[in-house]
UniProtKB/Swiss-Prot annotation:
Designated gene of the protein: Or85c
Protein's name according to its UniProt entry: Odorant receptor 85c
Its job: Odorant receptor which mediates acceptance or avoidance behavior, depending on its substrates. The odorant receptor repertoire encodes a large collection of odor stimuli that vary widely in identity, intensity, and duration. May form a complex with Orco to form odorant-sensing units, providing sensitive and prolonged odorant signaling and calcium permeability.
GO MF annotation list: ionotropic olfactory receptor activity; odorant binding; olfactory receptor activity
Nucleotide-binding is among the record's keywords: no
Cytoplasmic side: 1-33, 88-130, 221-259, 312-359
Organism: Drosophila melanogaster
Entry membrane topology: Multi-pass membrane protein
PANTHER family found in the cross-reference section: ODORANT RECEPTOR, ODORANT RECEPTOR 13A-RELATED
BP term (GO), one: signal transduction
Keyword annotations from UniProtKB, A to Z: Cell membrane, Glycoprotein, Membrane, Olfaction, Receptor, Sensory transduction, Transducer, Transmembrane, Transmembrane helix
GO cellular component: cation channel complex; dendrite membrane; plasma membrane
Amino acid sequence: MKFMKYAVFFYTSVGIEPYTIDSRSKKASLWSHLLFWANVINLSVIVFGEILYLGVAYSDGKFIDAVTVLSYIGFVIVGMSKMFFIWWKKTDLSDLVKELEHIYPNGKAEEEMYRLDRYLRSCSRISITYALLYSVLIWTFNLFSIMQFLVYEKLLKIRVVGQTLPYLMYFPWNWHENWTYYVLLFCQNFAGHTSASGQISTDLLLCAVATQVVMHFDYLARVVEKQVLDRDWSENSRFLAKTVQYHQRILRLMDVLNDIFGIPLLLNFMVSTFVICFVGFQMTVGVPPDIMIKLFLFLFSSLSQVYLICHYGQLIADASSSLSISAYKQNWQNADIRYRRALVFFIARPQRTTYLKATIFMNITRATMTDLLQVSYKFFALLRTMYIK
């Protein structure tokens, strides 16, 4: 499916087959399993080392280092949770994709009726931009220590950088000036790629599915509004029955979508609240300009991720509620009285807005981002107060 290609690319890079592909060979599946568990084990070891470092930094009174490593841990938690929930919900996701393929427009005529090209261009543009942003973020972090070494020590010769690693971790041995440095550098870069790809792939998958849901809602709204009604109750009732059935299929898609993504989205919002707070705090404690650029990129990427999810949540809410307005715009005045009475019930259902949900606790719209930023700022103010004291 064209909408899914970018998400599948990033899932493949971490060894995940997000939904069943009948044509996939057993050899490819075996390689995917090996790659997946290599990613998981490596990432788990790295985050365990970061957690140990957090304890050491806190006990030694290194407040800034503790906050820094907390932002790294939060980033990993979001990436791992998204990967594991997609891996766990593979059967449900496969059924969802099959249903999307079943109602996908076939042929040039249907594609034009659905305005497929418009939605596909929008999804592709957002997917590419978002994937590039996160890729630049993670590789800026991964290669930052190497670039510092090459620029400051080798090129400009203004200070000695030495061997440094991208992320703060606890090590029970001295890795400086020996071969283990290169192993650790590779493992940390590998872990950074895994965590970023886990987030990119799941966010792009959500983007692809949400775009198709909006496309079907919009198509149904146009069909309902443009339907020419007359006094033929038999024909009008058949049209209304088909409309209700189509609407129910879209609502079932949303139920499955919320079931698959609900918990990962809730974790995403909870952790992102603290990550935004931690990164913002680091930017206010007098870091060098090069570190400031890195932190700004981290903050901007985290905000972009939250906005992307909230944006698609808003699109789904708007598209679902607009169906009742389209039904009211019909020329129902010309229809049989029985159709008018039935139409009242149809109009009532879309007035109960369909939301993208982070479980039962949160309906996601653009207002959700405002709420998240308010909470994040409160924690930021608390953190600043603790640091000053």
